[in-house]
């Protein structure tokens, strides 16, 4: 059964777990600034020798997100393990679709991660083996 920790906090269960997967956007930061309560919680977990893994669905490589967190003022000790959906997608595509053609749906700023595939990017969607969607919003539907 899932336990709601809203009233009692993470500290009520922290001693029972060694590993914490923590989402970034909306949990650790809002895209502009860090949430002080969240960074305090991360500090408490590290003081208890807990393992932290920070996750995000950003279509960026892990190192770009680490640089972003550094610029926001987060100490490196908190983000030694960052995993992005962009990095996961890149690894999967490299293993399975490196020689296939694709059509990119999304803003140009999100394409940098996939530069190794640039030669396979095509302009006619009907000729694509797959779609690479880095954003699906009103402008793209």
Feature-to-residue mapping (PLM):
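HAD-like aspartate-dependent phosphatase fold
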Residues: 1-138
């Amino acid at each position: 059964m899932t336990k709601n920790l809203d009233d009692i906090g993470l500290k009520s269960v922290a001693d029972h777990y060694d590993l914490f997967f923590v989402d970034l956007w909306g949990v650790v930061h809002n895209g502009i600034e860090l949430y002080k309560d969240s960074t305090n919680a991360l500090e408490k977990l590290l003081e208890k020798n807990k393992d932290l893994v920070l996750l995000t669905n950003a279509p960026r490589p892990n190192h770009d997100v680490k640089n972003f967190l550094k610029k926001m003022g987060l100490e490196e000790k908190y983000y030694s393990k960052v995993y992005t959906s962009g990095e996961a997608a890149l690894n999967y595509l490299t293993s399975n679709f490196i020689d296939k053609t694709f059509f990119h749906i999304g803003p140009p700023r999100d394409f940098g991660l996939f530069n190794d595939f640039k030669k396979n990017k095509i302009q006619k969607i009907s000729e694509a083996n797959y779609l690479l969607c880095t954003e699906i919003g009103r402008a793209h539907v």
